[in-house]
């Protein structure tokens, strides 16, 4: 159990939060109350379902409503990403295309396409390369806003996780009614052309699901300010691939009305792997005994590569890996074991005797390869 888990257990016990939510509906808690145990910024950042403290169980979630107040309740706050290349929850008539080739003009000398590590860097390259123009069918999108800002005032309804949940007075037709008043929101990138404002939420790590609030709060802010349509886009950059997913809110007053409109994959490299490439890889591969590694339980190879990319920046403890990927700490070992099986990472003790997962020479060599080289290797 992590420190965050421990602190939330103390808060739940002190304020009898679970019982109050069950009997009376949403429970409001202040930043000052949370700060008695740990910094609120660290205690309220749960970007995936799996990152929620265990005391929240499978139905409770937390949302900010002002600069200093949060609400805890039986809220359905997360949405699953579709399987990459799969149908997911697409609007009828749309499809997932293959990986499109993009390019950066050769006069940009400051950009190394083989060393795009940060979310901000990936968003910059996405704009410069014309990826966003192609994906949204726009013309010359330019970045106009980014960073933290106040949400303004708005109300919305959010659905409960469980069907048949007890309905207090604040329960509406579609869910609980929540009022937001100048909560802090953050936009990774806002791009505008003549007809559209595209709002980008960027990640450089692969997750299975995401917190809808990351798109919904900024969407409500800008949808209330602008005459032109606001198009929320989630961008994930990993393994040299830009994955863009456009969403829409079919009812702007309903948090859970989110729908996936379309998905696109882009790369600055050649990603086509031929049968000849595969045959050559097979012919030069020597058969070796399997290493003595426990049974591999990792279920996403994309996350394995994403972990190696993060280890290239610095060694990570299992707890830090769990924080980066937004899952339980035990799952850190699932993905470490997959990396270890492939010879990409090992566990070592640092000077303070803390166990850290460290990238191997083979892992660093892998990341120096282009997309095709990584997949074939």
Role assignments for model-derived ranges:
Residues 1-116, 120-121:
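Nuclease-adjacent, charged terminal/linker segments that flank catalytic cores
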Residues 105-158:
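Low-complexity, highly charged intrinsically disordered N-terminal segments
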Residues 115, 249-252, 265:
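Extended, well-ordered protein cores
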Residues 132, 137-143, 181-197, 297-312:
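A short mid-domain helix/strand-loop element embedded in enzyme catalytic domains
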Residues 139-190:
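Active-site metal-binding core of divalent-cation-utilizing nuclease and nuclease-like domains
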Residues 196-198, 203-211, 222-252:
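Nucleic-acid nuclease catalytic cores
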Residues 257-377:
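Donor-sugar nucleotide-binding helix/loop cap in glycosyltransferases
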């Amino acid at each position: 159990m992590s420190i965050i888990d421990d602190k939330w257990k103390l808060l739940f016990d002190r304020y009898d939060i679970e019982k109050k939510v069950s009997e009376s509906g949403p429970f409001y808690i202040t930043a000052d109350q949370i700060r008695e145990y740990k910094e609120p910024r660290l205690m309220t950042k749960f970007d995936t379902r799996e990152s929620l403290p265990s005391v929240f169980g499978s139905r409770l979630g937390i949302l900010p409503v002002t600069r200093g107040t949060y609400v805890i309740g039986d809220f359905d706050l997360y949405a699953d990403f579709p399987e990459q290349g799969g149908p997911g929850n697409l609007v009828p008539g749309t499809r997932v295309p293959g990986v499109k080739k993009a390019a950066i003009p050769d006069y940009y000398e400051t950009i190394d396409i083989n060393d795009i590590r940060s979310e901000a860097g990936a968003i910059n390259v996405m704009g410069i390369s014309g990826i966003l123009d192609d994906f949204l069918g726009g013309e010359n999108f330019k970045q106009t806003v980014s960073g933290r800002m106040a949400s303004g005032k708005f109300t919305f309804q959010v659905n409960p996780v469980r069907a048949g949940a007890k309905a207090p007075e604040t329960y509406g037709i579609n869910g609980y009614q929540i009022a937001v008043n100048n909560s802090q929101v953050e936009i990774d990138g806002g791009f505008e052309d003549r007809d559209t404002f595209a709002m980008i939420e960027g990640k450089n790590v692969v997750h299975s699901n995401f917190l809808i609030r990351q798109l919904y709060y900024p969407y409500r802010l800008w949808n209330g300010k602008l005459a032109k349509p606001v198009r929320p886009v989630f961008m994930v950059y990993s393994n040299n691939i830009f994955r863009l997913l456009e969403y829409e809110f079919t009812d702007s007053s309903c948090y859970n009305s989110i729908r996936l409109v379309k998905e696109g994959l882009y790369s600055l490299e050649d990603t086509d792997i031929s049968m000849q490439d595969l045959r050559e890889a097979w012919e030069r591969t020597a058969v070796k005994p399997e290493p003595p590694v426990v049974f591999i339980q990792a279920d996403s190879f994309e996350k394995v590569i994403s972990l190696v990319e993060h280890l290239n920046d610095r060694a990570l403890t299992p707890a830090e890996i769990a924080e980066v990927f937004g899952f339980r700490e035990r799952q850190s070992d699932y993905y470490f074991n997959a990396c270890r099986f492939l010879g990409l990472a090992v566990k070592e003790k640092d000077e303070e005797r803390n166990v850290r997962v460290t990238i191997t020479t083979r892992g660093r060599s892998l990341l120096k390869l282009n997309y095709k080289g990584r997949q074939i290797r």
